[in-house]
A protein has these predicted regions:
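Short, histidine-centered active-site or binding-site loop motifs used for metal coordination
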Residues: 114-118, 155-157
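Metal-dependent nuclease catalytic cores that hydrolyze phosphodiester bonds in DNA/RNA
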Residues: 1-111, 118-122, 132, 223, ...
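Metal-dependent nuclease catalytic regions and adjoining charged, substrate-binding loops involved
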Residues: 2-13, 92, 124-125, 140-226
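Short amphipathic alpha-helical face segments that pack within enzyme cores
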Residues: 132-139
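Short, intrinsically disordered/low-complexity patches at protein termini
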Residues: 61-64, 72, 135, 172-173, ...
Length: 268
């Protein structure tokens, strides 16, 4: 289970002068997994996966700046605008975000965040980490004088736009994630990994985080899960025999016991 215990709301402290601005993406990571956010934000760890590479490829268009974000206009004034790849920050909130797209008219704006993959069929239209990241963008836009009541998540593979309202519940969840990230960053102690979570196998930092290995050391009753294979066209090779030896010969792997070959496996 990820975290079955209820969470108490954290206070939203003022930004310390010596603390760097928190990127919206890191608030997303904290909501997804506090340990992942700590490894990336505090320790500077990073590893690519097929998902992250594909995500960058799909973002290549929206990452190119285009259009301008005008100053907030009076109600009913101003033309509709689209501004791409806009970076805004708030010193008061201690936040910074690069927004894929901001749509607006006058003082009313809507941030649009592009995501790879298809829209998930869940009650709120999207998972909390993505909703929180979008809400951070809305909070920053409000700090700059705009009215921002909702955002849009655009899922590239299914080509669907999912509206996300910035209601009080989502705002509270977002403030709690911001405070939680600041708390663990200031604490200097790596959070424990999730336990038996389906989030871990596809995480790009699973080889650095080692969730199952760390949990097994902490409690031997927690059995390690089978290896997660990054490629769906390949299979893992398990060798459990005592005294077995693995060697590579050309494009094959050979398994032997007492110098007697017992298995040959072709590499893909």
């Amino acid at each position: 289970m990820d975290n079955p215990q209820p969470e108490l709301p954290m206070p939203f402290p003022a930004q310390a002068s010596d603390m760097p601005l928190l990127p919206a993406r890191m608030v997303n990571e904290y909501q997804y997994c506090p340990r992942l956010a700590y490894l990336e934000w505090v320790q500077g760890e990073w590893a690519d996966s097929s998902d992250t590479v594909d995500g960058r490829y799909r973002h290549r268009r929206v990452d190119k700046p285009g259009g301008t974000l005008p100053e907030p206009a009076d109600e009913g004034d101003g033309e509709r605008f689209h501004a791409r790849s806009i970076t805004l920050s708030s010193a008061r909130l201690g936040l910074i975000a690069r927004m894929d797209l901001v749509e607006g008219e006058g003082s009313v704006v809507t941030p649009v965040d592009y995501k790879r993959g298809k829209r998930p069929h869940v009650a709120r239209g999207a998972y909390d980490p993505e909703r929180v990241q979008l809400c951070v963008q809305g909070l920053i836009l409000e700090e700059h004088g705009y009215r921002c009541e909702q955002g849009i998540l655009y899922f590239a593979e299914s080509r669907e736009r999912v509206p996300v309202r910035f209601d009080e519940e989502l705002r509270a969840l977002t403030h709690n994630a911001i405070s939680g990230l600041r708390f663990i960053a200031a604490g200097g102690q790596t959070p424990l990994p999730l336990e038996d979570s389906p989030k871990c196998p596809r995480c790009s930092l699973v080889g650095i985080c080692l969730p199952d290995e760390v949990n097994f050391i902490r409690d031997e009753k927690i059995a390690p899960r089978p290896l997660a294979v990054a490629r769906d066209d390949a299979l893992p090779l398990y060798i459990q025999a005592r005294g077995a030896k693995l060697s590579k010969k050309g494009e094959t792997l050979e398994v032997s016991i007492d110098d007697q070959k017992i298995q040959t496996v072709r590499l893909i």
